[in-house]
Amino acid sequence: MRVYCAKNYEEASTLAADLIAAQILLKPDSVLGLATGSTPIGAYQRLIAKYEAGELDLSQVKTMNLDEYRGLDGENPNGYRYFMNHQLFDHVNIKKENTNVPDGKKDPAQACGEYDAKLERSGGIDLQLLGLGHNGHIGFNEPAEEFSKTTHCVDLSESTIEANARFFDSEDQVPRQAYTM
């Protein structure tokens, strides 16, 4: 694993976009693991700019998103499918059928099992973009949890619910569970 240090958000966003673009150029049918939240938005904006400048072709890329709230569907503005469509997918030439986000409307066993099967069929992730939550969570894997090798349903911590309430009309609307890799 390589560790990169950036001086600020702008530099980190550029570095992340450059690493993702290099992966796509190296392997046009790369499987990218993607994240949501405010951290990756700058990287996504730079990827869009590279695509618009003719420097990047995402037509063969497949994506596997890290997580989704349980109970939300792809049309919900607070859901991560919606987020990814608006922050990246709608602005580049990626095929929507090659973009994958856990199905928040399905029951946990079905949603997680189907997602793991998709991941296995994809051949695995070539490059994973991650962000760290305010309390150190990765995806929705809270710091006190043991990592799982499979997609699973987790109870969100109160601190995560409080932090994510800014994206909802009220804290009561924040789902209490999520599916995460």
Where are these regions (language model features)?
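N-terminal glycine-/serine-/threonine-rich phosphate-binding loop
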Residues: 1-32
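Generic structural signal for well-ordered alpha-helical scaffold segments
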Residues: 17-25, 48, 52, 85-89, ...
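Glycine-rich N-terminal segment of FAD-binding domains in flavoprotein oxidoreductases
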Residues: 26-52
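A glycine- and small-aliphatic-rich helix-loop capping segment at beta-alpha/alpha-beta transitions
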Residues: 46-57, 80, 143-153
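Ligand-binding beta-strand-loop-alpha-helix segment within the catalytic cores
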Residues: 56-128
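Glycine-rich phosphate-binding loop
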Residues: 123-148
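Class I SAM-dependent methyltransferase SAM-binding "motif I" and its flanking Rossmann-like core
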Residues: 139-181
